[in-house]
């Protein structure tokens, strides 16, 4: 295999990014030097390890997984694993950093020449869902293990995650400004409601089932843009919680 060969379809494999090109390079732990476009045997082996580590983290959860579990699943000796990474936490970091970096990188590339806010939102939703539908184990790891990293590793991943969230919020703000609506949903609510719709598909969506990815994207986009009861008069959507209703605790003594 040529060291310079690009994969035929990067959406079908776990993409390898520049693990050494960190914004806080002076503070980050030393990681293997791997150019993002050089698919050498070294790159492919680490990719293989990360893909299997993500699957095991998704199945057992991060804290219940040991490096020995990953060694057995990959057929790579413990000494071999530590040749590629220093710890289990570093594996988790590489998975999270790679995912956020890749999905953000592709999104920014696709949005580069797009001006219409609604088109930007459709691209955002399609980019997010199509990526994670192809990487369901990684999506579960991102959702469940968001706080499992600590220190500089957590800070580094959180920086990319925050950038991604701010981009979604900015697109929604542009849509609000374009529509000039007098009654507007709070931007924070809208942003996290959108991610809530997209991020939990690993609980129910089957990429091999009847609902294809393109149909999933279309349904989520329509639901977010138009609502479940599209066409219902606005006056019927007015709702105010009853005054005086107390929060309900699961513990009776707290009610």
Residue ranges: model-predicted function:
Residues 3-34, 130, 134, 166-174, ...:
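C-terminal peripheral helix-coil segments that are non-catalytic and often amphipathic
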Residues 45-54, 70, 91, 95-103, ...:
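Generic hydrophobic, amphipathic alpha-helix propensity
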Residues 35, 48, 56-90, 94:
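Helix-turn-helix
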Residues 140-143, 184, 235-237:
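Short, hydrophobic secondary-structure boundary micro-motifs
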């Amino acid at each position: 295999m040529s060291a310079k060969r690009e994969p035929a379809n990067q959406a079908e494999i776990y993409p390898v990014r520049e693990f050494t090109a960190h914004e806080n390079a002076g503070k980050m732990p030393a990681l293997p030097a791997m150019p993002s476009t050089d698919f050498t045997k070294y790159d492919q082996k680490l990719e293989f390890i990360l893909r299997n580590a993500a699957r095991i983290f998704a199945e057992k959860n991060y804290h219940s997984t040991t490096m020995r579990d990953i060694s057995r699943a990959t057929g790579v000796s413990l000494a071999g694993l530590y040749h590629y990474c220093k710890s289990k936490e570093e594996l988790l970091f590489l998975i999270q950093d790679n995912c956020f970096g890749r999905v953000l990188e592709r999104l920014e590339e696709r949005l580069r020449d797009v001006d219409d806010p609604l088109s930007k939102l459709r691209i955002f939703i399609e980019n997010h869902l199509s990526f994670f539908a192809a990487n369901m184990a990684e999506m579960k790891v991102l959702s469940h293990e968001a706080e499992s990293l600590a220190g500089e590793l957590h800070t580094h991943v959180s920086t990319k995650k925050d950038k991604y969230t701010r981009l979604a919020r900015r697109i929604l703000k542009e849509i609000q400004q374009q529509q000039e609506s007098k009654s507007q949903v709070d931007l924070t609510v809208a942003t996290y409601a959108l991610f809530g719709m997209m991020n939990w598909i690993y609980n129910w969506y089957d990429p091999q089932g009847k609902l294809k990815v393109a149909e999933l994207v279309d349904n989520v986009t329509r639901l977010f843009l138009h609502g479940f009861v599209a066409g219902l008069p606005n006056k019927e959507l007015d709702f105010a919680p009853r005054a005086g209703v107390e929060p309900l605790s699961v513990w009776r003594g707290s009610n």
